[in-house]
UniProtKB/Swiss-Prot annotation:
PROSITE patterns: CARBAMOYLTRANSFERASE. PANTHER family: ASPARTATE CARBAMOYLTRANSFERASE, ORNITHINE CARBAMOYLTRANSFERASE, MITOCHONDRIAL. The gene is pyrB. One of its GO terms (biological process) is 'de novo' UMP biosynthetic process. Belongs to the aspartate/ornithine carbamoyltransferase superfamily. ATCase family. This is Aspartate carbamoyltransferase catalytic subunit. Carbamoyl phosphate binds at residues 55-56, 106, 135, 138, 268-269. Transmembrane segments: none annotated. GO terms for molecular function: amino acid binding; aspartate carbamoyltransferase activity. Pathway: Pyrimidine metabolism; UMP biosynthesis via de novo pathway; (S)-dihydroorotate from bicarbonate: step 2/3. One of its GO terms (cellular component) is cytosol. It comes from Yersinia pseudotuberculosis serotype IB (strain PB1/+).
Length: 311
């Protein structure tokens, strides 16, 4: 059966329908159960990271290797023609697209991946994060993890805690879960880092329930998923960072009264917003969540590069 993601750019989670999201998740589950080490044999994929990354870059490159493809690229754009000689992003993508079958790209500028897609021809761009905007593959692994731990993506009570203003992961995840039914969002953040108005407006237009809170304690007993985020020092001025960095810290004692099925997730890296004593609780699932990135990203790459995919 021809798959709808073949040669499709993956720029925003909003570019994917519920059916397409479920296709990626089914493919990820199949690849987790049964590895396919030659599925992308002879394919070449560019890994173009214009912004620092550890987990996302290594996860993508591991995914590429485990599917049998080759990877080329860079993790320091200062040593590229774009960084040293002033080449435009459009020209850079126009050239790289002649070398490879797909391009995985992270960039600090919002909208950079969508711009790149205008110049990559038939070569799909996979957005690995563009500024504070979108991080669709993190969302796919988040969805995969929620489904794996809860057995569903409908009727989920999820709290998002911390930096909801600049945290692209929570923007994308909220938009994705809004495609499913009966979910309730609890947004817990200081005013300076509140969820953007456009996200709240989207939920209101879809008549999806959400509530705003200043305390984690009052909502823990209601939750299926507790999604923690770090305060992003690199996106704040020093005075703002100092004011909010320690406002929301999760300790094991905060999980008293939690549901048995509760899982604590975090896109990582964590700084001090989850204390290490939480790691030892049955609720901690953030390291397994990171590991699921391999399967979600394998699934996405397999789908954008295969006209037909039957696993």
């Amino acid at each position: 059966m021809t798959n709808p993601l073949y040669h499709k750019h993956i720029i925003s989670i909003n570019d994917l329908s519920r059916d397409e999201l479920e296709l990626v998740l089914r493919t990820a589950a199949s690849l987790k159960k049964t590895p396919q080490p030659e599925l992308l044999k002879h394919k070449v994929i560019a890994s173009c990271f214009f912004e620092a990354s550890t987990r996302t870059r290594l996860s993508f490159e591991t995914s590429i290797h485990r599917l049998g493809a080759s990877v080329v690229g860079f993790s320091d754009s200062s040593n590229t023609s774009l960084g040293k000689k002033g080449e435009t992003l459009a020209d850079t993508m126009s050239v790289i697209s002649t070398y490879v079958d797909a391009i995985v790209m992270r960039h600090p500028q919002e909208g950079a991946s969508r711009l790149a897609a205008q110049f990559s021809g038939n070569v799909p761009i996979v957005n690995a994060g563009d500024g504070a905007n979108q991080h669709p593959t993190q969302t796919l692994l988040d969805l995969f993890t929620i489904q794996e731990t809860q057995g569903r993506l409908d009727n989920i009570n999820i709290a998002m805690v911390g930096d909801l203003k600049y945290g692209r992961t929570v923007h994308s995840l909220t938009q994705a879960l809004a495609k499913f039914n009966g979910n309730h969002f609890f947004f817990i953040a200081p005013d300076a880092l509140a969820m953007p108005a456009y996200i709240l407006q989207m939920l209101e237009e879809k008549e999806i329930e959400y509530s705003l809170h200043e305390s984690l304690e009052e909502v823990v007993p209601e939750l299926d998923i507790l999604y923690m985020t770090r305060v992003q020092k690199e996106r704040l001025d020093p005075s703002e960072y100092a004011n909010v960095k320690a406002q929301f810290i999760l300790r094991s004692s905060d999980l008293t009264g939690a549901r048995d099925n509760l899982k604590v997730l975090h896109p990582l890296p964590r700084i001090d917003e989850i204390t290490t004593d939480v790691d030892k609780t049955p609720y901690a699932y953030y390291f397994q969540q990171a590991g699921n990135g391999i399967f979600a990203r394998q699934a996405l790459l397999a789908l954008v590069l295969n006209a037909e995919l039957a696993l």
